[in-house]
Each structure stands twice: as C-alpha cells, then as structure tokens.
Amino acid sequence: MRIVIFRLQANPIFEERRLTVKKWTWGLLTVFILVWLAVGGTGDRSEKDVCDIGGDPFESCTSILVGKLASADGSTMTSHSCDSTTDRTWITVVPHKTHKPGDLCPVYRNSKETRIPDDQSRFKSGDIPQVPETYAYINTAYPCLNEHQLAVGETTFGGKRELRSKEGIIDCPELYRLVLERAKTAREAIRIADELTKTYGYNDYGECFTFADPQETWHFEIVGPGAGKKGAVWAAVRIPDDHVGVSANASRIRQLKLKDPDRFLASANVHAVAQEMDWWDPSGDEPFEFCYAYGSRRSMGSRRREWRVLSRIAPSLNLDANAENFPLSVKAEKKLTVKDVLDIFRDTYQDTPFDMTRTVTEVSREGKASVSPVASPFMNREWMALLKVQSERTICCKAATYLQITQSRSWLPDPIGGLVWLGYDNPATTPHTPFYCGIKRMPASYMVDGRTRFQRDSAWWAFRTVSQLALFRWQPMSQTIARVWSAIEDKAFADQAKIEEEALALYKQNPAKAAEFLTSYCVKMAEDAVAAYWKLHDDLWGSYTYYF
C-alpha cells in the first residue's frame, strides 16, 4: 500500500518533483541511517565533508561580536562555534602562575587535537622566553577567556597558499593561549600577537580572532608572511560599541584607515607583502583591500552566514543574500541578550528560501502536504543526493565540537564579570551553561576527551549521542530535545542575577570563597545537564524505538 509521497525540490528556483515511496522503503531508509551512523555519522569525517558546500575547506566556524551598547545589559560578547570533527573535547582551567627569570615557555603545534592535557604526542615547535606571570584561562580547544575578562573567538579563512611559512613556531591555538596568558585587554592582545609573531613567526593558515574585553570588541585577521619568511601580516578593526559583527571563514577586512588608530591597526608590512607578491599595485586605480590582497570572497557558504547574521541583527537593511560583500558590522536594531545570540547560532535559514527542510514534504492519503518527519537541516550528503536537496552551509552545524558565547562586564569584579556560556556538539540540540572566569576547575566529565572512542564518562558524548539520534526523525525528536535544553538554559538565565549577587557579597568578604562558590555552582549546573542528557538519550531510544 502506498502511504507516503515526497514532494521534492532542491530550492524554490528548482523544478518541483514528486517521488512515490512504498511502505517497505522506510525499512530500507532506517537500515541506511543505521549503517551511516556506524561508519561515520558520529563524526569521523573531515570538516570539509561535513560542513563545506562551497569548495572551500575552511567553512567550519562562525563567530559573532557584540559591542557593549549593542547588548541588553552592557556586556561585550564574543563567540566561537568550533565546527570541527577533530578538535579535542576535553576542557580544563589553567591557573594563574608565576615564573622565575630565565624560564622558558614551550610552544607546541596543533595542541587543539590532543587527547589529554599533557599529551606527549604533541609536537614541540620551540621555546620562547617566559614572562614573570601568566594569567588563568579556560582552556577549550581554542582557549576562550582569561581571568581579566579578555575573551576571544575564532574562524579560519585560509588565505592565499603562498603566505604559508614553515619558518615560524606559533600556530593559531598557541597564539590564542599566549595572548590570554599575557594580555588584559583586546588592544594589548593585538600588540602581543604582533610582537610574538614578528619575533618567532606565524606558521598557520589565515585566521580571524574576535577579541572582547569589558570595554571594546576587535576583529583581528592574521596570515603568514610568505614561504621562507618569519613573521606575519595582520590587520584589526574595532567594532563600534553599538554594532554587531560576524566572521564566517572568509576574510572580512577591506580598506584600512590607519590614520585612525582608535579604530584601525595593522602590521608594519601590511602593504609591503601584497606589493612584493604582486597582489596590489599602489600606483594603480584599485584601493588596498586586505580581504582581496590576502584572501578571497568566493565562498558562498561563508557569505550566506554573514548575510543571515547581519540580517537578523538589522533586518531593515534588506541585505542581498547573494552579495559578494557585506558590512563588517551593523548597528543592532534591538539590544541583544546571550539568549538572542544563542538563537542566531541555532539558525538553519528557517523561513527563508534556503531552508533545506522546506522542500522535503510528505502527502497524506487525503492529499494534504506537510513537512516530512525526517526532514532535517543536518542531512548528510547521501541523504541530500537521495532527496534532491540543495545543500546550504547553515550557521548551526551538526559537526560542532562546542559553542562558546562570552560575556565581559566592566561593572563587576573580573572573577564574576567574565563568563562563557558553553555547550558541546550541535547548538540546536544542546543546552549551554555558564562558566565564570574565576572558577578553579571544570566538571570531571568535561576533562575527558571523547574523540577516540565512546565513553560514558565524557560529557561530550552525552550531547553527541542525543544530537545524532535526532537525525533519525528530526521534526518530532528535535522538539522533544528542545524541551529539555530550553528548561536547562531558562533556569541558568533566571538564576544568573541571584547567583552573581551572592558571589559579589562573598567576594567583598573573601574572594577565595566567591571563587569556590562559583566553581561549585558551575560544576553542578553542568553535571545536572549531562545527567539530564544521558536520561534523554535513554528515553529517546524507548520513545522512538519503532522508528529505529
């Protein structure tokens, strides 16, 4: 008996098709999904395979910057959706340390893919002189927040391959670590990044760092100096206080007004390297534009995310979804909360022509069409080919290792004013809980890496298993899951003011007691979320067993 008809189209601009599916096909599709999950659906694939749609392997992160006058409470915010299938899942708190004269600081390569904090498989690139003291920081795969409320997000844009140099010893994650250990403000971080890369060399791809301190937010881009050279080329633009900016794996900085150092900064060689490479002629008609000199604007997967973020922040601009360039930042038409930023990171182009679920429909016996229960914005390539769906690189990515959204607040003491809202795996299926920059430890399950094998004691797997189960029958299961994550987040947001009031009272009496109070709160909040998700995992198997 025929029970389902799919109405399929790749996009509104594509021809509509109809596909009749017999009842037994559901069984075959279920087997297909089980096999897919077993051989690679849980993440053992390249970033390009999972996230990329535009032919650029660097479509794997998104970062949003919020100025203090663009936020609802005066916070500055930065963020990073670490959309990678290889980066480590263990997270620790590295304490404040003092060092002796003559001490050296080891520099490692690719520390973001280690499996334990002291992984001996790390390749040591070299040593640099240590500073007298290094600041405490929350050590995510790309370290995110230090004890002075300096926060940083990241996206890779690659840059031109001729810029890569093997002469340097500092890669992107290590540069993150070094500036968070040594800087108190975004401007100081940029200065230190310049000094370190100038002296010891930068050896990684083109990267964007999105810095936030309690007063300012900065968009910083860096590339190598060219083969055989030691150094780096970089530029930075301050995001206006009432603006929101975005980076999505494409270079964004265009013209530099270096006579205005309050808003624009750059390396001393920013023009010279482009001239040497014949990428810019100062005597020509075209102005120098950093993104075209050292990168490109080809990736539609990047541009589409830029369009969507900025359109949600300033809808009255009516930005063209297919434009090559967008403003680096826009004035917020509504002041944003952390919850608002989270909602953007969960965006899958819903209610737009680029929503991948809108063309996968089923038709009942009565002839009524509706979205199919299996329609998902996170279908793999095989599913999209089968259902003739045009792939889009959405803001929300099923390959995420974690999403961080930081708050830095000038009116509170640093240990209370700085915090990161952190959630593992797909933002669409995961709750995000707070971790203050003054805490002393992470939950035990957050310090267990989950990349090499399934481990019940790894927090990452609690959220990963739920997000992967949801792909079987996305429409109903995602709603079930949303009820759980929204309850956890709503409680965290509702309790925030009270928790911080108690912490502030303790801080005035004894800062150490305030730190332990916040540590206990953050650890319990996270552990409760992990426990809730293991229960949800078990409940989903029972509730949807007929469909597996």
Residue spans for each PLM region:
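Bacterial Sec-dependent signal peptides at the C-terminal "C-region" and cleavage site
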Residues: 34-49
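A contiguous strand-loop segment
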Residues: 48-172, 192-339
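Histidine-centered catalytic/metal-binding microenvironments
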Residues: 485-548
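Substrate-recognition/cap regions that form aromatic- and gly/pro-loop-enriched pockets
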Residues: 371-500
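Glycine-rich, aromatic-lined ligand/substrate-binding cores of catalytic
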Residues: 275-416
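Bacterial N-terminal signal peptides that target proteins for export
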Residues: 19-28
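Short, Lys/Arg-enriched N-terminal segments with co-localized hydrophobic residues
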Residues: 3-20
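Short, well-ordered beta-strand elements within core beta-sheets of diverse protein domains
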Residues: 176-182
